[in-house]
A protein has these predicted regions:
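Conserved alpha/beta-domain cores
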Residues: 122-126, 131-141, 148, 186, ...
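Long, charged amphipathic helices and adjacent flexible linkers at domain junctions
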Residues: 72-75, 85-86, 107, 178-183, ...
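Conserved catalytic alpha/beta cores of large enzymes that bind or transform nucleotide phosphates
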Residues: 219-323, 327-330, 362-384, 392, ...
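Conserved metal-phosphate-binding beta-hairpin within the catalytic cores
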Residues: 143, 317-344
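N-terminal beta-alpha lobe that positions the nucleotide/phosphoryl donor
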Residues: 1-192, 289-294, 301, 309-313, ...
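Extended active-site and interfacial segments that coordinate phosphate-rich ligands
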Residues: 142-175, 202-273, 338-372, 420-427, ...
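Amphipathic alpha-helical
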Residues: 150-188, 281-308, 313, 334, ...
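Acidic, glycine-rich flexible loop/linker segments
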Residues: 343-347, 372-404, 408-523, 527-544
Length: 743
């Protein structure tokens, strides 16, 4: 027995990850970081811990053990009313009891010492529960126990500590322990009392060193919103989301491969009301429409995330993706890490097979092809069922197995019915909200952050929830038929041929990267432009001259961007970058845009810049557009995007592909424009690129589509200026045989 085993109080610098049995997973991790990582520049606010021994001492001295044992004798967690009754009785008994004086005295002294350390009369603190089996792989305890923010004053700290201890017996915590096979009395609860970061005046969020949807391990995922972090953790807001690519970040590149702006309607701040120390307020329209973090802050957090992951990986002797909470002090503008724990959902999955779900709505009547609700997809599955709208937690017992839960947000109190739902839809929240985390753990589809599900759906309505299409989650009216196909990737044979993939949506790239491959043979820019940009490039280049109605529509799409051209470049670069990152360091062949005039016309503002052609298949398309004065500036934006991917993201594995190039002379004109924009064939950019074993060589390569008979007849001339061909069999067949593929 160590000298720490019988302590009521331990400080962060006295504990490490070896002390989970004494202080719980969350507090052990805080101690580990505070002791080992603050010296590396990672800021962690200080604090002290009321130990698990103190909890056990309190329960025993207050005579609560026999009462709890008696309450649990006829516990039935499948009976929600029974569960609620038992949990409430135990919690009330704990809160009514007095904390022993010997523990109170030590808490009081420690709180005074913490306040003095920060030169405050009474420090504002975060009081967090930490169970002794918490945050172990296989047991996420996602929000099962309580956190109290802006706890100020000795008396309030006493009360918060006691309520945190009582939260070991929350309904969801009891249910979770039963589901996971934990013995109730083998788990104790410690309480961390940590100096608050003034993120109420700044911002906060969560960070994962793994993609939370696919389990792809080479990215850092960061969510950010204004105010205190509980809004993000509880899923009460749709936050900004950022992705940073680890391998090239480690090489020194500012590799932010994705930035998406969230709605961030509300934030949590300090309140002057002593009974309610925090309150929710609306975020100003200006702050809703800007990114919470700048690039420097995103990169700082990502580097900290890598350092923390590296430390925990070395300590565990195996890969240890991490789940962290961060906060930015609005007074000092400093960033802090306030929690870190192992990620317990995706990191535990084995990627031996890929189940592909697909839903084809094209054969439905015209009125039913469009989704009735759209939000952020969680998972990749499809489910049908009857809607059950629940707003009040007291109505949970009315929910029936197989129904689809529709609500504003979820918190751990909802987990008993989430376990029996076929799908979940929420008005608010992002990919790291409570609803999203639990849905992934349960393996059911969810659509979060819809904004209008409660007004669009009705209880009893039959719907189909589709999360199989990347980041967008779609909800359709009625029960629709879908396909499900399982691919066992362990049985795929080794091949001598370099088998590359065709990738459409960047959002699916991380998942498909688990299939054995040698890179990407074709990634089309058109998919990125249609799904992420939606606006004709010339409309963005000529934004100021557009009519007011069109400008208003474009403003909604380009939130966060004053310069509309930057929006086009950034979103195109992000789409290319995600695909490049997913298959790095293997080659990823990206084809410049090959919309025909009728397809370009469907983009917002497109009709003003596209001619009407009788046969667009043979018209103004491919390379002929790129040097035409009417489109040349738009093509330069594509070049800027590709340059950004290679030189800023560090993804030198990107290969350019020119479509529908009729003559070598036309090809040379395109190459000249690319060179003007800093994309010179054979160039490597500002840093060395090590070609992988499966790469087709080093240096910036430019291929051309072989899809016109002239490409075949003049192949040697084309290969004098290009590095290779990609055969486009559809167009080559129609132009050779005189058939129209659109007829």
């Amino acid at each position: 027995m160590s000298d720490k085993d019988k302590k009521f109080i331990l400080w962060f610098d006295q504990v490490s990850n070896d002390d989970v049995a004494l202080v719980g997973g969350k507090n052990a991790s805080l101690g580990e970081m505070y002791t080992t990582l603050t010296g590396k520049g990672i800021r962690v606010p200080n604090g002290f811990i009321v130990t698990a021994y103190a909890y056990k001492y309190f329960i025993e001295k207050a005579g609560l053990l026999s009462f709890i044992e008696n309450e649990l004798k006829d516990l039935d967690t499948k009976d929600i009313k029974n569960l609620q009754k038992k949990g409430k009785a135990i919690r009330e008994k704990i809160i009514e009891a007095d904390i022993p004086k010997e523990i109170e005295e030590e808490i009081a002294k420690s709180y005074k010492d913490l306040s003095n350390a920060y030169k405050m009369e009474e420090a504002d603190t975060a009081v967090r529960s930490s169970a002794t089996a918490e945050d172990l792989p296989g047991a996420s305890f996602a929000g099962e126990h309580e956190t109290y923010l802006n706890v100020v004053g000795q008396k309030n700290v006493f009360e918060a500590v006691k309520m945190a201890m009582a939260s070991l017996w929350n309904d969801r915590a009891i249910s979770y322990r039963v589901d996971k096979g934990f013995n109730h009395f083998e788990i104790a609860l410690s309480v961390g009392v940590q100096k608050m970061v003034r993120s109420d005046k700044g911002s906060s969020g969560v960070m994962f060193t793994i993609d939370t949807e696919s389990g792809f391990r080479d990215v850092v995922e960061i969510d950010a919103s204004w105010g205190l972090g509980e809004m993000v953790v509880q899923g009460k807001v749709t936050p900004d989301a950022y992705l940073v690519f680890k391998p090239t970040l480690n090489q020194g590149f500012p590799a932010i491969v994705k930035k998406s702006i969230g709605s961030k309607e509300n934030k949590m701040i300090y309140s002057s009301d002593k009974e309610k120390p925090t309150k929710e307020v609306e975020v100003s329209e200006k702050d809703r429409n800007i990114f919470v973090l700048n690039d420097e802050e995103i990169l700082t957090l990502a580097k900290w995330g890598l350092e923390i992951e590296k430390h925990y990986t070395e300590r565990a002797g195996k890969a240890m993706p991490m789940d962290m909470e961060w906060a930015k002090d609005g007074i000092t503008n400093e960033l802090f890490i306030v929690q870190a724990r192992p990620e317990t959902v995706q990191s535990e999955k084995k990627h031996n097979s890929i189940t592909e779900y697909s839903l084809d709505v094209r054969n439905l009547p015209a009125g039913r092809q469009e989704p009735i609700v759209v939000g952020i997809a969680v998972g990749t599955k499809i489910a049908s069922g009857k809607v059950h709208i629940i707003i009040d937690v007291n109505k949970l017992s009315e929910f029936e197995k197989g129904e689809i839960l529709v609500t504003e947000i979820t918190d751990p109190d909802w987990e008993p019915i989430m376990k029996i739902a076929s799908a979940i839809i929420t008005e608010k929240g992002g990919r790291t909200s409570h609803a999203a985390i639990v849905s992934r753990e349960l393996g059911i589809p969810a659509v979060v952050g819809t904004g209008n599900a409660l007004s669009k759906l009705k209880t009893g309505q039959m719907i189909t929830v589709d999360t199989s299409n990347g980041t967008a989650g779609n909800v359709y009216d009625g029960r629709l038929e879908w396909q499900e196909k399982i691919h066992d990737i362990t049985t795929l044979p080794e091949t001598k041929t370099k088998v590359c993939m065709n990738i459409g949506s960047p959002e699916s790239a991380f998942i498909y990267s688990f299939i054995p491959n040698k890179g990407v043979g074709l990634a089309r820019e058109e998919f990125i432009i249609v799904s992420s940009i939606k606006v004709h490039p010339n409309a963005l280049l000529n934004f100021e001259s557009l009519d007011s109605k069109l400008k208003t529509k474009i403003e909604k799409i380009t939130l966060g961007y004053e310069n509309k051209v930057d929006f086009y470049v950034d979103k195109l670069a992000e789409g290319i970058g995600q695909i490049g990152a997913a298959f790095y360091p293997n080659d990823v062949v990206v084809r410049f845009s090959d919309f025909k005039t009728n397809e370009y016309s469907t983009l917002l503002g497109g009709e003003d810049f596209e001619p009407k052609e009788e046969n667009p298949m043979l018209g103004w398309r491919g390379a002929s557009r790129y040097y035409d004065p009417k489109f040349k500036e738009a093509f330069k934006l594509e070049c800027r995007a590709m340059k950004k991917v290679r030189e800023q993201f560090g993804l030198k594995n990107i290969v350019a592909l020119i479509p529908f190039c009729r003559t070598p002379e036309e090809g040379q004109k395109v190459l000249d424009i690319m060179k003007e924009e800093g994309l010179e064939r054979g160039g490597d950019g500002p840093a060395p690129y090590q070609a992988s074993a499966t790469s087709f060589g080093s240096g910036f390569k430019v291929y051309v589509m072989c899809e016109i008979p002239a490409n075949v007849l003049r192949a040697d001339e084309f290969l004098d200026i290009f590095d290779g061909f990609s055969i486009g069999s559809n167009d080559l067949a129609q132009l050779t045989l005189g058939l129209d593929r659109d007829s």
